[in-house]
Amino acid sequence: MPNLASWFRILTSCRWNIAIPIALIPLLIGCPSRPQPTRNSTSHTDQEDALAAVRDTVRKEHKADTFKTAVAQLNVYLGRPTDAKPAIASPSERDLLANKLHLSADELKEVLREDFSPLDVHYLDECFLFHDAARGLKLDFAQKSDAAQLERGRLCFAWAMRQVWLNDKPSRPLPPSYALRMGFGNLAERTGVALAILQVIGIDAGVVGIAKDRTTLEPWCLAMRIGNEIYLLDPRGGKPVPGEGGKGIATLRQVRKNPALAQAYVQANVSNNDVASTVANSKVWLSPPLSSLSPRMRWLQSVLPVNPPVALGADVLSDIDEFAKAGETIDFWNPEGDITSMTRRLSHFVRQSDGGFEPNPPGQRLIDSYLSSLVPFAQMPALLRGNVVTGDPANRLRGIFSQRFLKFQLEVDQPRDQVLRGHFDDANRALVELLSEIKTVQRHIAGETDLDQGALKWAEDWRHAASQVERLKRDKRSEQEIHEATSRVAALEKAADKMMLVIERSASEPFAGMITFQLALCKHEQAERVARTRRDEADVIRDAWQNSAGWWRNYLGRFGTAGWIQPGQINHAKKLLAEVESEIAKLPAAKSNP
């Protein structure tokens, strides 16, 4: 019997050795505490060497371990005598944090601390995921005009909408990086992903909406400030709001003068359908992430010469002035204790032992429902959903079923991560190889006889053997008898081939669907880059778009009616296919061969 692990490298090398779920790894990593400051004098060269070490670390692979190391190095640097340190928050800034952003005493302590914290590891990990995504978009950062910045904002918003389809379920919203890796989310999550990528490229953004009361905000558009104008984007529909006459992107100034431009967006998102009144009374609301409010983040972005530049810190006092130049008096949305606001979304997702403020106990934390949403448990073999196999072996077998989905979607350098960071060649190779491996497994399964009966017999034999071990222990029988019974259980666990094949049969189709969707999305992203960077090569652009269209049709034709598909995913695929077909239709006719 061939070893299944040789067919499926996505699984662990040992079938019974199930690792900690990948999404938990960043939360389980302990961050180093700040070293005790040294009292020795430090030369300017030593100071520069310490900062150079931080820069070298951040240039490496962007994952939690990288930023754990960087935080430790930063705290070593800050522990030495040096003038190049983060500024201290001014009294007016402290007042705004306490009275406008309604930070608790513990949150203020986190924001105002002078050294870098365990929570900063998670924040930097999130920021650099979005920074890598922006770099993968191949944007032109050399142009500094408002028009160029508007185009960068439009392209980043479009990318966020492609990567996260709308599954508008009522639930506590995830932090942006987690919603992004998941690939779908409710309206608040989709909005959060767009805000996060706009933030890291240096565009001030928030939402336009009306506060029903002190704890309920009804946003109807996303707003990004470019120069002295505020442009409106629709995260529900995934498109910019059209301006007057359908031209360009509508500005808030235009909508204030002509509320009819916002009618569809107000009616879709606000309980009060009096459009004119809603537009007149709406504000621009900002909700910067908690960690971004710290002066140390503004300092850090000034000493990290990355390309393109990365915006890590929010200057809320400056934001007030800049939006005022655009004619708007902004406000901040972060009601006291509201863990769903963008300000608290990441900080209250991270558990307290890792520097966060997650209020719920294990089993009730947001991470638990997050992991569950990524695995099609309804497709799991009935033997594992019932009580035929129980205890630790059942958990291991369920892990073998679920681990591939978690690893594929969440782990650094797995295909989803590669697509997000713009590593398309690596993603293509990995995705095609995975589809080939699934076909190999499916061909082997097709040649099996009595697979279900064999798996059931194994499960019943294992249950009997495990029960015997428990009975012998309970009756305090001899060590020899217990050892022999335990050996029988171990032998059965090594001979679980039929059960393993049943698991593979159940997992292969939903996993193939996940892979095919990412492959179509990867081809779509590649075609989008080709269309922007090789504008004079119509045939090359056409080939890229047609390749993408072929994969979208492949996905929809094979999985379009599958019951395990997440709500909204098929509609999203259809929309992206329609976009591709529209792009192809705009191209000049293909040159005929002589």
Give the positions of each predicted feature.
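Helix-turn-helix repeat elements of alpha-solenoid scaffolds
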Residues: 431, 484-498, 542-549
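Hydrophobic/aromatic-rich core segments of domains that either
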Residues: 126-144, 152-162, 167-171, 177-178, ...
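Bacterial signal peptide processing site
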Residues: 31-34
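Residues that mark the junctions of alpha-helical repeat units in TPR/alpha-solenoid scaffolds
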Residues: 407, 461, 505-507, 512-514, ...
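Alpha-helical junction/boundary sensor with strong preference for TPR arrays
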Residues: 438, 499, 506, 552, ...
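Specific register positions within alpha-helical solenoid repeats of the TPR/Sel1-like families, i.e.
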Residues: 419, 436, 443, 463, ...
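"A position-specific structural signal for the A-helix of alpha-solenoid helical repeats
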Residues: 511, 518, 522-525, 569-579, ...
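Secondary-structure boundary elements
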Residues: 62-186, 216-218, 227, 387-390, ...
